[in-house]
């Protein structure tokens, strides 16, 4: 029935009485091996490559005789029924033989994972340790702690599970009731609780190893595949399967879903299988699906699960056309939305995409919800349109001249208004025919009834997020009513916007005046020249035989101006005669002027309005976020300005169609402490130099400023031998991952090399750095050491001064080395000055392909190429002919080194560029790469370096300000533009 390699069973053999054989009631088998062969019931071991299992049959006989009663009904155990009403996530009930099998599958998979890990760590035969230590030293202990803790937890759970399965839990078997099952762990059967704990451990181990196991390493692949198999058997509920189904280590909760919903058709075994459902797909699972002819995989997971092995195999399969993947993201424990169910139904109904496999993480919650909603969608009732006579159609069309059909067809009303039409008419309909017409369907169309479902009942009761916005509150206060917005939404108050189709204009009066409906309403409220008051209860005003023009109505000089009352329900009230009067034009004109003046006065708040309310008005003053105000012309096209940095995107409406800058892209940055800093890292030049200056600075910081002083371990050894400096602390140089969390700012004593060392010391965020010039050049060190007390006080107490402390955020470059298209572990560097790829000692010119966002831009043939930051522009790049760039400019410099082509000039790229320097396969020789002049290593053919802006800059404290310090360094260190003055004539 099952195999078990659990070592805990071996010492039990000596304590059990032998038996003559296995009961005939247990003589059946189910294929559980990975190669598809049927394995007989019993335990199997291998000794010297010779299988033996007769002695272990005695163990099973003795255990089953003690743990289980003879009337368990093992003869009736068969493959799990296809009835999905049996709560598949619970698993088999306690005492079932399927429960024992599920336990042993987990034991066996865990044993294999443990063996693969131990063999990878250290070969038991040769004693060779084969673990690559390419990752950084500070990450090594964290990884070891995670793996050891997770393995210890798994071992503890396995021992507990073995004891439970071997002791034969008769009490839990008798007390368990399926009706009492809930989500809480205390009400779940023991197997479900055990699987839940094992799942958490496996997922923790997955997260710990996902960044360190790469597909190009065979040993990593073995460990990863064993881990995924253990996860699958933990995800699986534990029911037995048919012989032709994949084993539980490949897919959890594998189950076919049939097209028919009736139990008689399903049990007939002739029913068509619509698709298969189950748990996550792994590398081996994908291989099985392809070999068995599956064409489509539907992934219901909304979360991101990092599995490089599976993703690599999936990309290859997709590129070869072997499989198609459809993403329908659904959150955990949530039901799919209506549009997602419709999309899924369309995929299932397409016979060219079958066979189909649908999966989530475990194949239980989201897949069950999708199957249920899919069946509900497929069995929904179909309604047909009620036939309407031609006469009634003409009557309705004449009554609603510009009804929803014309609007939906796109004649003058935008899509946003179309959505409102369908929503309003859908609520306001009274018959099937009017509903089909008002929702935008053309005559003669027949469709299924709207398929609507609430994916989350709680969220469906939550009002929209903008219900209390300025726009919505203004609409509500102006409406002076409490009725739903779908029935009594007031017309738009701003000229130039297309009114909602609920308020249609169907009348035309003589004349060439442009009349606004709000003006007519005000006239109706105040009365005409004869003193006749128009009714104010009408919710919309229709002008007979009128036509749209930019959201306004062109009126003509008919003797009687008819104003009809349209209630929005397809029926129009009798027109109201309005005698000719000059008050109409005067009222409209005066109202337009008053409204224009009001909008000019409130132009400051116009940016808070939505796009619909920001329409162009002839003769009106408009404003935008650019700060430029001018008169908008109706003939001028509107535009949007979209700003994106490759990560985020913002949209700014430019209503006056004029682009302008309101402020420079970079400004001066000032350092302000929310709380007083307490810890400082004191760095100095290597060797015994500058020890006196370091002692002086440390004493000042500790005794006068009451700060904790940290130094590097080598410097701490020197301080430890000096009396009176026991307050100096240190850190472990091998673990600097959390150093930035302990240090408030850094004080550097030396030259530019100390600042580069500080940049290399912090892998992520870097605290503010104040540097004192005690080196040979000191381009980046703008503070003289003579003023160190004053400068340090300004940094520590910068909040209490009026001028504050200015800092410069110096951009760094993140560099990653790739080999054969795969990232090399531990080969990630943050560069402050430059990265250099050169030919090294090779006699041939280097050939380097340069890509920007995966596009080949050029090929460098020369001694090499430099990619520098603005800070490094005054170093190696300047010597190679590059420009000198202010450190505040967000860019990167691309400078060739002695190029073979004289037309190859240096260029400056934006900081959003993503470069890749690749050594092509046809290059004559390899190349070398160095980062800030250190960590030099060889690049073979096919290797590449990817370069992009680092998230964390290096903040340096200025002596005066950014520009002043930079020009002083140019003059002091590089003698920039130093020459004799020209004599006067």
From Swiss-Prot:
Pfam families to which the protein is assigned, alphabetical: NAD_kinase (PF01513), NAD_kinase_C (PF20143), PTP-NADK (PF22741)
Transit peptide: 1-62
GO BP, sorted A to Z: NAD metabolic process; NADP biosynthetic process
Tissue: Expressed in leaves.
pH dependence, entry free text: Optimum pH is 7.9 at 25 degrees Celsius.
Catalytic activities: NAD(+) + ATP = ADP + NADP(+) + H(+)
Positions with biased composition (Basic and acidic residues): 390-399, 413-429
GO cellular component terms, semicolon-separated: chloroplast
Keyword terms of this UniProt record: ATP-binding, Calmodulin-binding, Chloroplast, Kinase, NAD, NADP, Nucleotide-binding, Plastid, Transferase, Transit peptide
Region Disordered, residue ranges: 389-466, 548-615
Annotated region (Calmodulin-binding), positions in chain: 335-380
Biased composition (Polar residues): 548-569
InterPro entries: ATP-NAD_kinase_N (IPR017438), ATP-NAD_kinase_PpnK-typ_C (IPR017437), NAD/diacylglycerol_kinase_sf (IPR016064), NADK (IPR002504), Prot-tyrosine_phosphatase-like (IPR029021), PTP-NADK (IPR055214)
The family this protein is said to belong to: Belongs to the NAD kinase family.
Biological function: Involved in chlorophyll synthesis and chloroplast protection against oxidative damage.
Protein name: NAD kinase 2, chloroplastic
Biological classification of the source: Eukaryota, Viridiplantae, Streptophyta, Embryophyta, Tracheophyta
Gene that specifies this protein: NADK2
């Amino acid at each position: 029935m099952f195999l078990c390699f659990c070592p805990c069973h071996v010492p039990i053999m000596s304590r059990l009485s032998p038996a003559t054989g296995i009961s005939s009631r247990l003589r059946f088998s189910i294929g559980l091996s990975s190669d598809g062969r049927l394995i007989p019931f019993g335990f199997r071991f291998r000794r010297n490559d010779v299988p033996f299992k007769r002695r272990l049959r005695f163990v099973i006989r003795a255990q089953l005789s003690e743990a289980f009663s003879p009337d368990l009904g093992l003869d009736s155990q068969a493959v799990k029924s296809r009835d999905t009403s049996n709560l598949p996530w619970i698993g088999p009930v306690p005492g079932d033989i399927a429960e024992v099998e599920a336990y042993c599958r987990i034991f066996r998979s865990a044993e294999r994972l443990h063996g693969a890990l131990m063999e990878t760590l250290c070969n038991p035969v040769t004693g060779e340790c084969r673990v690559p230590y390419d990752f950084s030293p500070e990450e090594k202990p964290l990884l070891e702690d995670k793996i050891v803790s997770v393995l210890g937890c798994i071992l503890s759970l396995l021992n507990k599970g073995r004891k439970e399965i071997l002791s034969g839990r008769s009490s839990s078997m008798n007390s368990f009731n399926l009706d009492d099952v809930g989500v809480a762990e205390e009400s779940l059967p023991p197997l479900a609780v055990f699987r839940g704990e094992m799942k958490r451990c496996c997922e923790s181990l997955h997260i710990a190893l996902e960044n360190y196991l790469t597909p190009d390493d065979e040993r990593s692949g073995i460990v990863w595949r064993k881990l995924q198999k253990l996860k699958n058997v933990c995800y699986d509920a534990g029911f037995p399967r048919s012989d032709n189904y994949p084993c539980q280590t490949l897919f959890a909760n594998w189950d076919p879903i049939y097209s028919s919903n009736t139990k008689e058709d399903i049990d007939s075994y002739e029913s068509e299988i619509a698709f298969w459902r189950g748990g996550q797909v792994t590398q081996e699972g994908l291989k099985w699906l392809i070999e068995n002819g599956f064409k489509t995989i539907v992934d219901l997971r909304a979360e991101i699960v990092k599995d490089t092995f599976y993703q690599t195999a999936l990309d290859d399969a997709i590129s070869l056309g072997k499989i198609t993947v459809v993403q329908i993201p659904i959150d955990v424990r949530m039901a799919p939305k209506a549009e997602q169910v419709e999309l899924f139904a369309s995929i299932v109904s397409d016979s060219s995409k079958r066979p189909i496999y649908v999966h989530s993480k475990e194949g239980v919650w989201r897949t069950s919800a999708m199957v249920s909603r899919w069946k509900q969608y497929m069995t929904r009732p179909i309604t047909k349109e009620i036939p309407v006579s031609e006469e009634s159609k003409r009557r309705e069309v004449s009554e609603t001249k510009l009804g929803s059909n014309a609007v939906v067809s796109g004649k003058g009303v935008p899509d946003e208004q179309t959505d409102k039409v369908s929503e309003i008419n859908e609520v306001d309909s009274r018959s099937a025919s009017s509903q089909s017409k008002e929702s935008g369907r053309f005559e003669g169309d027949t469709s299924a009834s709207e398929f609507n479902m609430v994916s989350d009942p709680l969220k469906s009761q939550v009002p929209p997020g903008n219900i209390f916005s300025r726009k919505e509150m203004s609409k509500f206060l102006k409406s002076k009513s409490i009725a739903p917005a779908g029935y009594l939404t007031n017309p738009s108050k701003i000229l130039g916007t297309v009114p909602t189709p609920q308020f249609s204009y169907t009348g035309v009066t003589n004349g060439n005046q442009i009349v606004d409906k709000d003006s007519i309403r005000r006239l109706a409220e105040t009365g005409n020249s004869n003193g006749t008051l128009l009714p104010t209860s009408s919710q919309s005003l229709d002008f007979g035989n009128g036509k749209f023009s930019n959201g306004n109505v062109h009126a003509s000089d008919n003797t009687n101006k008819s104003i009809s009352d349209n209630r929005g329900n397809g029926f129009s009230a009798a027109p109201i005669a309005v005698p000719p009067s000059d008050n109409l034009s005067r009222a409209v004109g005066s109202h337009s002027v008053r409204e224009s003046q009001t909008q000019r006065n409130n132009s400051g708040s116009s940016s808070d309005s939505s796009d619909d309310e920001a329409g162009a008005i002839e003769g009106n003053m408009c404003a935008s976020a650019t700060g430029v105000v001018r008169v908008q012309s109706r003939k001028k096209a509107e535009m949007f300005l979209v700003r994106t940095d490759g990560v985020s995107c913002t949209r700014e409406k430019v209503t006056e169609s004029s682009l302008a800058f309101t402020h420079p892209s970079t400004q001066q940055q000032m350092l302000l402490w929310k709380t007083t800093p307490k810890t400082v890292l004191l760095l100095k030049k290597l060797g015994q130099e500058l020890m006196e200056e370091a002692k002086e600075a440390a004493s000042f910081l500790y005794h006068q400023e009451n700060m904790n002083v940290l130094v590097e371990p080598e410097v701490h050894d020197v301080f430890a031998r000096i009396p009176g400096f026991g307050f100096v602390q240190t850190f472990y140089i091998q673990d600097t991952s959390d150093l930035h969390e302990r240090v408030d700012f850094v004080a550097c004593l030396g030259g530019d090399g100390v600042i580069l060392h500080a940049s290399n010391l912090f892998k992520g965020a870097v605290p503010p750095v104040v540097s004192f010039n005690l080196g040979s050049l000191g381009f980046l060190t703008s503070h003289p050491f003579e003023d160190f007390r004053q400068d340090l006080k300004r940094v520590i107490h910068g909040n209490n001064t009026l001028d504050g402390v200015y800092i410069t955020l110096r951009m760094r470059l993140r560099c990653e080395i790739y080999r054969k298209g795969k990232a090399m572990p531990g080969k990630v560097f943050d560069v402050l000055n430059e990265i250099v790829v050169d030919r090294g000692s090779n006699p041939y010119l280097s050939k380097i392909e340069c890509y920007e966002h995966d596009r080949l831009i050029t090929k460098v043939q020369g001694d090499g190429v430099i990619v520098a930051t603005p800070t490094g522009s005054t170093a190696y790049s300047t010597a190679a002919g590059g420009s000198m760039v202010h450190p505040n400019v967000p860019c990167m410099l691309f400078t060739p080194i002695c190029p073979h082509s004289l037309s190859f000039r240096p260029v400056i790229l934006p900081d959003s560029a993503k470069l890749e320097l690749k050594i092509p396969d046809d290059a004559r020789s390899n190349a070398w790469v160095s980062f800030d002049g250190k960590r030099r290593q060889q690049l073979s053919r096919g290797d590449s370096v990817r370069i992009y802006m680092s998230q964390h800059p290096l903040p340096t404290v200025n002596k005066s300000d950014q520009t002043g310090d930079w020009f002083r360094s140019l003059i002091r260190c590089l003698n920039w533009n130093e020459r004799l003055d020209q004599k006067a004539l």
